[in-house]
Amino acid sequence: MAKVSMIQREAKRTKLVAKFAEKRAALKAIISDVNASDDEKWEATLKLQALPRDSSSSRQRNRCQITGRPHGVYRRFGLSRIKLREAAMRGDVPGLKKASW
């Protein structure tokens, strides 16, 4: 089980990403705009750098919803490989069964 502080830190990052998503998208649009002047692009770059570091979506980590484990997490289920296997063996995941050939 992951430390509670790590899970809370990840939740904080998720909130920050949601809070600054529109602002980041607008600034990135200005930076990548061909028609924008160099001064506008430079100011947008400085404003983007001034935003909180954790407001970037690339700083988020997929974690297991049950244990908080950061590695081996299946996006489709939101569970780590260990908990997904346990749930599949119990029959809790509809349509998922053990492979046999």
From Swiss-Prot:
Keyword match Membrane: no
- The answer to whether keyword Ligase applies is no
What Pfam families does UniProt report for this protein, alphabetically? Ribosomal_S14
A molecular function GO annotation: rRNA binding
- Superkingdom of the source species: Bacteria
Which keywords are on file for this protein?
Ribonucleoprotein, Ribosomal protein, RNA-binding, rRNA-binding
Gene Ontology cellular component annotations, sorted alphabetically: cytoplasm; small ribosomal subunit
- Report any one BP term from Gene Ontology: translation
Q: How does it assemble?
A: Part of the 30S ribosomal subunit. Contacts proteins S3 and S10.
Q: To which protein family does this belong?
A: Belongs to the universal ribosomal protein uS14 family.
- Job description of the protein: Binds 16S rRNA, required for the assembly of 30S particles and may also be responsible for determining the conformation of the 16S rRNA at the A site.
Identify the PANTHER family for this entry: 30S RIBOSOMAL PROTEIN S14, SMALL RIBOSOMAL SUBUNIT PROTEIN US14M
| Official protein name in the record | Small ribosomal subunit protein uS14
